[in-house]
């Protein structure tokens, strides 16, 4: 037993009931009754007609009572150690006074600069004296072959 659906109202159409309309372009519409067919032919929007399934769906009619809203899980802050730094180290750095932190940073920068300076000096000392540049070679002039004379009259 095949149960169809009305093209206008959305209600079920049981065998032996309903009417099928075939348009010139080959589109088929099955209607439950003449009321649906007439409304379709008058080009009434089924979403605006109160007794259709589309209207009831649009305005959320006849649905079971809404379930309680899903509770969203809130993210919780969690502190843990990172590779190369234990939790106690991280907490100690965080609780440091800004002046102390600034002094530490300046000291670290100074040490890095000194290191860079010393490596540069060592590199300079070990590098040999630059050689005098050799005289550039003279380029040979290109020999171009003369093309054959054009033959064939006017173009």
UniProtKB/Swiss-Prot annotation:
Pfam families: Ribosomal_L24e. GO terms for biological process: cytoplasmic translation. GO terms for cellular component: cytosolic large ribosomal subunit. Keywords: Ribonucleoprotein, Ribosomal protein. The keyword Transferase does not apply. Residues 96-117 have a biased composition (Basic and acidic residues). GO terms for molecular function: mRNA binding; structural constituent of ribosome. Residues 92-155 are annotated as: Disordered. Residues 124-133 have a biased composition (Low complexity). Signal peptide: none annotated. Gene3D superfamilies: 6.10.250.1270, Ribosomal protein L24e (2.30.170.20). Belongs to the eukaryotic ribosomal protein eL24 family. This is Large ribosomal subunit protein eL24. The gene is RpL24.
